[in-house]
Amino acid sequence: MTRTLQAVANPFADLDLDRLRRRTSAKWRYYPEDALPLWVAEMDADIAPPIIAAVTDALELGDTGYALGHACARAMAGFAVDHWGWTFDPDATANVTDVMTGIVDLVRLVSPADEAIVLTPPVYPPFYGVAKKLGRTVVPARLGPDDRLDSASLEAAFAEATAGGRGAVLLLSNPHNPTGTVHSRAELDEVARLARHHGVRVISDEIHAPLIMPTSTFVPYLAASDTGPDLAVASASKGWNLAGFKAAVIIPGADAGPDLEPLRQPGGGHPGHIGLIAHAAAWADGGPWLDAAIAGIDANRHALADLLREHLPAARYTPPESTYLAWIDCRALGLGDDPAAAFLERGRVALSSGIPFGDGGAGHVRLNLATSPAILADAVARMASAHTTTAA
């Protein structure tokens, strides 16, 4: 079904930095006020009006009890059909507190304690935290030089992880954080083929799936071939800036439904009712706002290329195909393995260090594009000042 959507203005076009500094979330409170924060994945935009309305209505009604049902998954299912041409059964899903909680639960449920976790570095640092929390060995399958999944690397990692007849789990970032790569259907088909051959279960983190740039097409992992034993975890958290309203949905492959039964029982780690209301409103009615946000991010990702070309021409950067995260190779700037530290100390701009992303992360930074053009320009100017100070 195609919905008629009303245009919304770019939510990043005109942001008041003083107003942003009144926020008390991690992005704006972790570093001192003289540092410009473009690190953690929070947007600087205001929340989409349909979400504000849905949450306000619930609060005014006193609808603040326990969560029940699959309304959020049903709203997501409508979005998935409209935007990705993909269908899934919302009644087969399970609600969880957030994506990472869901991933920890799934690894425990589908994988014995002695099995390894395969990761595709450089990749989202909390994936390593899952392995540490559960006492698992990490087997890396490094991305290729083009920042895409590498079939040979996956084949070798799967073989190593499953040596001796064990199984293993692949934590897939789809689309990929931090590079913003959107995996193609052919690439996902190959992941599934290799996983089936080696007895690997795939858990796909699709939290950034709503944030696909106009030149790319997102393919849900479970839409690929032969993904029956696998699972995906999705959330409106990143697409609509709802990290403070925790909620996520686990979607099982065709054969994985029984694995979710323990998560449906009372007493588990379920999301709050208001969080599910906020996320359902995002999936169902947040499309126009999301389109405007993507247009703003699209403009910023290209503006960053121009700014770096002007102020830091030795930095290497390819505009991401998705997310609002820019992965910048700073190795030629002479700032060492952790250029984020130099940018913070000498330029007072806070970026994410590439080191925690694992293999291939040293010498890189991750920059948050979900801000105003003026703040983005200020950030690059601060980076350039830090580089000049270091060179001197």
Q: Where in this protein do the model-derived segments appear?
A:
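PLP-dependent enzyme catalytic core of the Aspartate aminotransferase-like
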Residues: G78, D338, A342-L351, F357-A392
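N-terminal small-domain helix-loop-helix segment of the aminotransferase-like
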Residues: T2-D98, D105, A284, A392
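PLP-dependent aminotransferase-like
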Residues: R108-A168, L172
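Helix C-cap/helix->beta junction micro-motif
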Residues: L134, H197-H198, G228, G347
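Active-site phosphate-binding strand-loop segment of PLP-dependent enzymes
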Residues: P145-T217
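Conserved core segment of the aminotransferase class I/II
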Residues: A223-D298, H387-T388
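Generic structural signal for small/hydrophobic residues in well-ordered secondary structure
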Residues: L38, V55, M76, T93, ...
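Conserved glycine-rich beta-strand-loop-beta hairpin in the small C-terminal domain of fold type I
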Residues: A280, I297-A305, Y317-C330
